[in-house]
Amino acid sequence: MGKGMKIPLRYQISEYDCGPTALLNGVSYLFPRAEVPPEIIRSVTLYSLDCYGMDGAAGKAGTSRMAMMYLANWLEGFSRAANFPLSCQYISGQAVHVGAHSYVNDAVARGGAAVVRLFYEVEHYALITGASADRIYLFDPYYLAEAEPEFVRAGIEVTCAHPHAYNRIVPFDCFNRETRELYAFGPAETREAVLLFDERTRRTADDTIEYFI
């Protein structure tokens, strides 16, 4: 039944579940389907979507920073206790940027991935899986079949050709802005990311040609 198979990354099924979808996509990106413990799926679903909308409806403001930090710590603790080779690190503030001396760039260069909070009309979560000299490879769980005009203006490519890894190719310049524009990380004090690794395949600095791009 293809137990060693990695599955395509998933899209959110509502306007609100980008957080749990991006986090579970990080796990799917790193691990084959047969290796993923059901407890991870259960707990990510249980502890996300904790924010209430303006009308008082549960989940309608998505997933909070507190919940994402809790889940990163829970995943790290669970993985140690269960001897599962996932490691997680939560970073925030000035530590979240792309480019030189970036924890995010370092993570993907070492074979990991990063769930990041950014802006796409509202605050949003997506998964960074790769980087080149001036582009970030991103899987945005919000489905688009083709680029909208604002993506074209920003130089962002939309692709469905790499379902296991990315569906957007985004210039570095988009991320480090402190504004609420498309894919900006926004003000430094509100930034956050979760770095994820499969410890069996995590590369060292000596193995990584593009270490700290």
What are the residue ranges of the model-derived segments?
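Active-site-adjacent substructure of cysteine-protease-like catalytic cores
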Residues: Q89-Y143, A147
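Noncatalytic regulatory segments and standalone regulatory/sensor domains
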Residues: V108-A109, A131-I213
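N-terminal entry module detector
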Residues: M1-G2, G112
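Hydrophobic transmembrane alpha-helix bundles
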Residues: L71-L86, V116-A131, R153-H164
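Compositionally biased, intrinsically disordered low-complexity regions
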Residues: G4-K6, D55, A95, S132, ...
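Cysteine-nucleophile protease catalytic domains, especially the papain-like/related folds used
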Residues: G2-G93, I209
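Short, exposed beta-strand "edge-strand" segments with a Pro/Gly-rich flavor and a Y/T-containing core
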Residues: E15, R33-A34, A57-M66, Q94-A95, ...
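Intrinsically disordered, low-complexity boundary segments flanking structured domains
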Residues: L71-G77, A100-V104, R180-L182
